[in-house]
């Protein structure tokens, strides 16, 4: 089957998501705030807040960066050029010093959550005596220092990674480090400024063409790398149920009907394209830069009898998307636009607007961040940019996205925030990953396993607590001739979309809950 389909590396199995292990630490009673007990998610045992934007003053920082070079220039009798010279020399060191100092001395946002104060050594096992002596008791280790040491094998968790990370406020500091600032200034920012086409291609293919088994070992048989949707908070739905819920929600929110021309930008392994084609009769074009994903998506559609004339996956840059006469009736983009970058975001939206039929619908699922940030959020974001999604610099607060969408000419019909749904999805991905530990380490090494272990565990927490989140935004063109009345019956929230489901999810699940990729391809 691998030769016939053009897909390689199918000699792996999907696992059934295992139960979460018993917590390694005694249950914390009366932590100071109410906690939840829902089966659908990994409930937070210690939901503490840290310091952040409420104690950070941009005006003071800008004043320092402006006044100090001017004062130095004045002292030597210089003018504007001399001031500019001193700014080049002293502003970066002052900026770093400011970040290091303020992030270290700022108090927690509130003290509502009572920390157990067990000491760093209760949670971490350092390999070197110097580290054991340095980080113990209340002398907490900076988060960036910790994860770099963890990836290098210089420290281990005393227990399950996710469980120890849940207690992180008791053993870690979120103050900035020299390494974090260095990466931001000289690693991330140049990419944000440049963000070239070749950079996009290199980063996407390095990430997504690593190996289908690498992703299959945590994504499961749906091979969907975006948030699922919870339909019932009082039971633990499977990962596959969460993803099937999401597929349904997308198709119902856009009012998909048989024969609709649909474009899925950043389609991944093509599961949404196949679902929309098979369950709704749509004519779908999926676009991805991943070669492995292209082969997988086309093979899976041919397997179930969807002809290429109806639907296909193409391996192209989004800037080269083929457009049919009249445009696409429905356009979807799930967690791809963040990779476009801040520099190109408006031009990307303009392109989508131009490709969309005047009475069409655009659905954007967008991973964003909160505006009232905490230092933990920034530390996590820089980790993600360095190790997981390099170049995905357009993860922003909702207001920024809405402003760009409306400025491009879209009218927003509905917005749902699905961060906690993402946490539920990540929790299941994490358990799959841990269950495949031996296989991952044997093929990709312990370092790659640890990076993804940390990513999946930490992101389960981050998306649950609001540091990062995800938005579903449904839009039409904001022009006078748009038939807005046609969209009234499909102006759904999450549960409205699920209640209106026109897909045969039972049949879909029966065909797709498989043990090996070969059964799909």
Curated annotation (Swiss-Prot):
Asked whether the UniProt record includes Nucleus among its keywords, one would answer no
Locations listed in the record? Membrane
Q: Which gene encodes it?
A: MT2
- What is this enzyme's EC? 2.1.1.317
What is any Pfam family matched here? CMAS
Instruction: Give the transmembrane ranges.
Output: 60-80, 85-105
**What name does this protein carry?**
Sphingolipid C9-methyltransferase 2
Query: Signal peptide position in this chain?
Result: none
Q: Name one GO molecular function term.
A: methyltransferase activity
Q: Please describe what this protein does.
A: Catalyzes methylation of the sphingoid base component of glucosylceramides (GluCers) at the C9-position. Sphingolipid C9-methylation requires 4,8-desaturated ceramides as substrates. Glucosylceramides play important roles in growth, differentiation and pathogenicity. The methyl group at the C9-position distinguishes fungal glucosylceramides from those of plants and animals and may thus play a role in host-pathogen interactions enabling the host to recognize the fungal attack and initiate specific defense responses.
What pathway does the annotation place this protein in? Lipid metabolism; sphingolipid metabolism
């Amino acid at each position: 089957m691998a030769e016939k389909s053009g897909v390689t590396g199918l000699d792996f199995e999907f696992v059934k998501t295992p139960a979460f292990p018993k917590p390694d630490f005694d249950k914390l009673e009366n932590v100071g705030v109410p906690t939840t007990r829902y089966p659908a998610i990994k409930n937070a045992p210690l939901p503490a807040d840290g310091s952040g934007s409420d104690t950070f003053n941009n005006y003071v920082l800008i004043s320092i960066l402006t006044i100090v070079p001017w004062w130095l220039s004045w002292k030597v009798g210089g003018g504007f050029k001399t001031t500019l010279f001193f700014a080049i020399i002293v502003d970066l060191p002052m900026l770093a010093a400011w970040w290091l100092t303020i992030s270290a001395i700022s108090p927690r946002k509130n003290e509502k959550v009572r920390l157990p104060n067990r000491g760093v050594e209760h949670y971490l096992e350092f390999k070197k005596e110097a580290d054991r002596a340095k980080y113990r008791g209340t002398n907490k280790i900076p988060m960036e220092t910790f994860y770099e040491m963890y990836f290098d094998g210089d420290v281990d968790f005393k227990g399950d990674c996710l469980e120890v990370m849940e207690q992180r406020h008791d053993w870690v500091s979120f103050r900035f480090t020299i390494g974090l600032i260095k990466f931001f200034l000289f690693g991330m920012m140049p990419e944000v400024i440049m963000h070239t086409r070749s950079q996009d291609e290199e980063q996407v293919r390095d990430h997504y063409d690593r190996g289908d088994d690498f992703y299959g070992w945590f994504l499961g048989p749906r091979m969907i790398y975006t948030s699922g949707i919870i339909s019932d908070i009082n039971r633990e739905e499977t990962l596959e149920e969460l993803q099937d819920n999401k597929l349904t929600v997308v198709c119902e929110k856009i009012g998909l009907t048989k024969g609709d021309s649909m474009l899925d930008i950043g389609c991944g392994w093509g599961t949404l394209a196949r679902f929309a084609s098979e369950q709704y009769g749509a004519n779908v074009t999926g676009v991805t830069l991943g070669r492995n994903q292209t082969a997988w998506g086309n093979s899976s559609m041919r397997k179930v009898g969807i002809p290429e004339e109806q639907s296909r996956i193409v391996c192209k840059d989004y800037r080269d998307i083929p457009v049919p006469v009249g445009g696409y009736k429905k356009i979807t983009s799930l967690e791809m636009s963040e990779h476009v970058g801040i520099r190109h975001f408006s031009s990307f939206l303009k392109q989508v607007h131009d490709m969309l039929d005047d009475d069409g619908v655009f659905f954007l699922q967008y991973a964003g961040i909160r505006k009232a940030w905490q230092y933990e959020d920034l530390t996590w974001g820089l980790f993600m940019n360095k190790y997981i999604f390099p170049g995905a610099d357009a993860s922003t607060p909702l207001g920024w996205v809405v402003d760009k969408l409306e400025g491009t000419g879209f009218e927003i019909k509905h917005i749902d925030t699905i961060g906690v749904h993402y946490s539920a999805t990540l929790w299941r991905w994490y358990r799959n990953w841990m269950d495949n530990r031996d296989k991952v380490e044997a093929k990709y090494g312990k370092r790659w396993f640890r990076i993804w272990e940390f990513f999946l565990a930490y992101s389960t927490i981050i998306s649950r607590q609001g540091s990062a989140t995800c938005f579903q935004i449904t839009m039409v063109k904001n022009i006078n001739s748009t038939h807005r009345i046609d969209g009234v019956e499909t102006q759904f929230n999450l549960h409205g979309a699920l209640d209106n489901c026109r897909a045969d999810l039972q049949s879909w699940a029966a065909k797709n809950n498989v043990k090996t990729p070969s059964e799909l391809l």
